[in-house]
Amino acid sequence: MPYLQKPAKQKNRQINREDRRKIYDTSQWRKLRSAYLQQHPLCQLCQQEGKIVPAVDIHHIISFMSTNDHLKRLALAYNPDNLMSLCKECHQKVHNQP
């Protein structure tokens, strides 16, 4: 019976997903996210356009997945200066930009 190997790209996505979960599933992240949303309850991009829209997501300005260095990854993930509060629509726009 032939062995079907997962394509490398799909394997990498799975590994990335697992690495992201290691951050997002921590109590440290949940507390930081909650505190940041309390301090920045409005979408920061909508505010720049003069709109008042509640934020529901927290976006990392520099993705913590942009490095393979564990310490740098943690620093990017938990640095409040690397975060933005966004509405769903703006968060999708940011991630869909080329």
Language model feature labels by segment:
Residues M65-N82:
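Short linker/helix segments within small regulatory modules
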Residues M1, S34, P80-L83:
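Generic N-terminal initiation segments characterized by hydrophobic and/or small/turn-forming residues
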Residues Q28-M65, E89:
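Short cysteine-rich loop/turn motifs with clustered Cys
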Residues R13, I62-S63, V94, P98:
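Intrinsic structural disorder/low-complexity segments
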Residues R20, S34, L74-A77:
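Short N-terminal micro-motifs specific to bacterial/archaeal maturation
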